[in-house]
Regions:
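Charged docking surfaces used in two-component/phosphorelay signaling
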Residues: 17-24, 113
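Short hydrophobic/Thr-rich beta-strand motif most characteristic of the beta2 strand and flanking loop
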Residues: 27-33, 41
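Acidic catalytic/metal-coordinating carboxylates
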Residues: 34-37, 61-64
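Active-site beta3 strand of CheY-like receiver
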Residues: 46-52
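Receiver (REC) domain active-site loop signature in two-component systems and cognate sites
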Residues: 57
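C-terminal output helix
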Residues: 106-115
């Protein structure tokens, strides 16, 4: 699994750095700070297996990015990592076929377990 490639998309540098610390020893990581950059990275890198995607970002809503990614790559695993705790937002992410939903602040083990589970499924 250490060769698995994960795209991290979050506008907060601290969150990106935390995820890099948690996942960097286990996976190959690409980090971007916007939905637009995530879409660009995915078009340039076809071997990404999982996307960790924030919802609230400047310019682009993560749910819109999720929907656009799923139209192009329906089998790509996308895990939402967000500060939104609402059932409605989680339900919308599930409806759009998100593979997981993690609320910030997150625990390292929660990230590792969710990524591992998605890689194995």
């Amino acid at each position: 699994m250490t060769n698995s490639k994960i795209l991290i998309c979050d506008d907060e540098e601290g969150v990106r750095e935390s995820l890099k610390l948690i996942l960097g020893d286990h996976y190959n990581l690409i980090t971007v700070d916007s939905g637009e950059m995530a879409l660009k990275a995915l078009s340039n890198c076809k071997d990404v297996q999982i996307v960790l995607l924030d919802i609230k970002m400047p310019k682009t809503n993560g749910l819109d990015v999720l929907q656009e990614i799923k139209m192009k790559s329906p089998h790509l695993k996308i895990i939402m990592v967000t500060g939104y705790k609402s059932v409605e937002t989680a339900a919308e992410a599930a409806r759009l076929d998100a593979s997981g939903y993690i609320v910030k602040p997150f625990k390292s083990q929660e990230i590792l377990d969710t990524v591992k589970k998605n890689l194995e499924s």
